[in-house]
Amino acid sequence: MKNSESLKEFKKLNSDQITEKIDQLRKDLFDLRFKQATRQLNETHKFKIIKKQVAQLLTLSKSQSASQTTSD
């Protein structure tokens, strides 16, 4: 259920907000990798969640840009 809720929230964002969210999630992913390398990470499931959210946001971003291109 939580994933579908986050997808609904992502669809409400504009292109600038999507870009900011992608940057933030990529930073979080970097931090997780760093913690894993230093053996401080206990919640390894977050990798999958963040990667999925980045993919969803990239898909939304591309679909929004495609719809803007066709409408122009």
UniProtKB/Swiss-Prot annotation:
Sorted UniProt keywords: Ribonucleoprotein, Ribosomal protein
GO cellular component: cytosolic large ribosomal subunit
Name listed for the protein in its UniProt record: Large ribosomal subunit protein uL29
Gene Ontology MF annotations: structural constituent of ribosome
One Pfam family linked to the record: Ribosomal_L29
InterPro entries: Ribosomal_protein_uL29, Ribosomal_uL29, Ribosomal_uL29_sf
Alphabetized NCBIfam families for the sequence: L29
Family per record: Belongs to the universal ribosomal protein uL29 family.
One example of a Gene Ontology biological process annotation: translation
